[in-house]
């Protein structure tokens, strides 16, 4: 991504500067409100599918809108979420349900077998990172579902710093959510999806720039 940097402009002594803090505060509040809206949509449509058949398409639909938001698009959130939910109903279930099942099994074993907690925690962390890459990949690239997990795994292994950052952010979200459980209903899921998407789009752009510099398309 190319950025143009303008020459610095210095205000004369005594001149009033623009209230940048107010603008930043507004932008931060707008992002929190958006994450809360995304959270509500995710919960409603997960429940609409009876949880089991709703969580997959609701998750992929949320990532679809999060990507569009991160790329600066303007859209009507409710009809676009409904459209994405219907469009991704089958693929979302195929993508998310196996991930949720394996993560649930690992969490159960983590609590059931104290002696194996370290290897289980490592496996759980790696799977979380793979999911954190795979879901944004699913809505950003034209990839078939069977290719998503190998691609996400390779990306996780070749970009360790980015993977550690994603795992840190996810752990922070989980910690805050367990400390304040009401956030799960208000903000946690939508906030994580938007943060994950925002970070991954930048990781993808950096990777594409490196490949382009090497002459690899």
List each language-model region with its residue ranges.
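Helix-coil boundary and N-terminal low-complexity module in membrane systems
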Residues: 1-120, 128-178, 182-217
């Amino acid at each position: 991504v190319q950025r143009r940097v303008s020459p610095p402009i210095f205000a004369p002594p005594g001149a009033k500067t623009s209230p940048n803090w107010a603008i930043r505060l507004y932008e931060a509040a707008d992002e929190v409100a958006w994450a809360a809206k995304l959270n509500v949509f995710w919960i409603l449509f997960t429940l609409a599918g009876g949880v089991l058949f709703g969580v997959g398409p609701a998750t992929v639909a949320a990532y679809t809108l999060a990507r569009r938001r991160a790329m600066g698009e303007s859209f009507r959130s409710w009809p676009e979420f409904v459209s994405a939910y219907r469009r991704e109903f089958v693929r979302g279930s195929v993508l998310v349900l196996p991930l949720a099942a394996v993560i649930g099994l690992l969490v159960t074993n983590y609590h059931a077998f104290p002696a194996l907690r370290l290897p289980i925690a490592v496996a759980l962390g790696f799977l979380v990172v793979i999911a954190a890459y795979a879901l944004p990949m699913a809505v950003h690239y034209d990839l078939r579902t069977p290719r998503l997990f190998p691609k996400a795994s390779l990306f996780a292994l070749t970009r360790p710093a980015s993977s550690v950052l994603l795992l840190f952010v996810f752990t922070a979200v989980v910690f805050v959510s367990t400390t304040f459980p009401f956030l799960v209903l208000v903000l946690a899921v939508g906030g994580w999806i938007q943060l994950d998407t925002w970070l991954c789009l930048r990781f993808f752009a950096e990777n594409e720039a490196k490949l382009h510099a090497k002459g690899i398309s």
